[in-house]
Amino acid sequence: MPTYKSLTLILTIALMTVGTATADVTKSDQKQSAMETMKIATISKMYQQDIDEQGMSNPAVLQQYANTELQAAMTLEQAYFDKNQMSCNVDYDVLWDSQDPDYTQDKKLSMTEQGLVQVSLAQGSDIYYELSCDDNDKDCQIADVILDDDGKTLRKHLLEACR
């Protein structure tokens, strides 16, 4: 009989441990899902503002949603323009991957496995955003925009080209 009680005790402890591990995984999945929802909501809000203002926001809508590092790179670009009367920025609207954006085109927002927000535009372009989020404020900011398949980013481009 003591063996039976020992076995029951071991099984009970094992099931409690599995239950706790499952709860931790569920909490982690929920936190990940909430973070993804926050990221997509931020990008969706940014695009809606750009559509509403037809790209005429001042400062630019991307700068309004950027974190401090990306804002600093964008400020560097403005200083370069003021000094040299020429742009060191990319020569198109990054949000729409176009020089003449179609604000009415359909777009689809999704998450990549790398945690980037992907915006797939009806014109066939995909734009990828890296966001930094603060759990406490339920707020996300754009840390960078991936410009090409080689992984070149807007922030890196501005820091290199606008010196």
Language-model features: locations:
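Surface-exposed, charged secondary-structure patches
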Residues: D24-K27, M74-S125
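Short, aromatic-enriched amphipathic alpha-helices that serve as compact interaction elements
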Residues: K31-S57
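Bacterial N-terminal signal peptides
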Residues: T8-T17
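Bacterial N-terminal signal peptides that target proteins for export
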Residues: M1-T8
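Short, well-ordered alpha-helical segments enriched in acidic and aromatic residues
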Residues: G55-K83
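Low-complexity, intrinsically disordered terminal/linker segments enriched in charged
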Residues: T112-Q114, S125-D126, D144-R163
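Hydrophobic/aromatic beta-strand elements that line small-molecule binding cavities or substrate pockets
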Residues: I127-D135
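Sec/Tat signal peptide C-region and signal peptidase I cleavage site
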Residues: G19-A23
